[in-house]
Amino acid sequence: MIKTLDNQVIALAGLAQATHLVRQIAQRGSADAGDMEAVVRSVFAIDADDVPSVYGGVDKIKTGLQILDRQLAGFEPPDAELARYGATLILLERKLVSAPRLLETLRTGIEQVKEQAEYFGELNDTVYANLADLYQRTVSQLRPRVMVNGQPSHLTNSTNANRIRALLLAGIRSVVLWRQCGGERWKLLFQRSAMRKEARRLLQSSQ
């Protein structure tokens, strides 16, 4: 992937959208289906032509761009919980890259679930369950774990739990993409203004 600021911002928007949806499901028991499909399908978009295509187009991650715009508004992100989810996934991605066995399990598993998704033609409960299982067998083996806050009734519901884990896996996918596009943690501190400007430009272009 081309290492440009706009590509990094698109990938970060994917991460922001995934973590936002995790919280919505954890707290409300539901989330926007279109927003969810865009980021979850990114897990399967290994051979996309460009970064926007990973999510099906910039317009599919408008929610993530809006959240990213708000999070970059000041030196400290206004939404500490979403920032914590994102920071934990960024840390876990580094650890995953350093664990070849888990990484290979993840790659093989994604290919298998991708075939299932193509067979069903949709992201049904079986696809979400298999993505959740893959997350548990790979990313969940690393520390720290992503501690999701929410209503116990939603968190203990198996359908919701599967969707949350699938979205966390999608978040990892966005972090991998961000790294491939030249993303570095220091840029989150020192390029905030430039990234926010780019997020707003992308939002306007997706109208």
From Swiss-Prot:
Gene Ontology CC: cytoplasm; plasma membrane
Q: Which HAMAP family match?
A: HflD_protein
Alphabetically sorted, this entry's keywords are: Cell inner membrane, Cell membrane, Cytoplasm, Membrane
Q: Where in the cell is it found?
A: Cytoplasm; Cell inner membrane
Q: Which NCBIfam families match?
A: PRK00218.1-2
Spell out the family assignment given in the record's similarity comment: Belongs to the HflD family.
Give membrane topology per the record.
Peripheral membrane protein
Which Pfam families does UniProt cross-reference here? DUF489 (PF04356)
Q: Which domain of life is it from?
A: Bacteria
What is the designated name of this protein? High frequency lysogenization protein HflD homolog
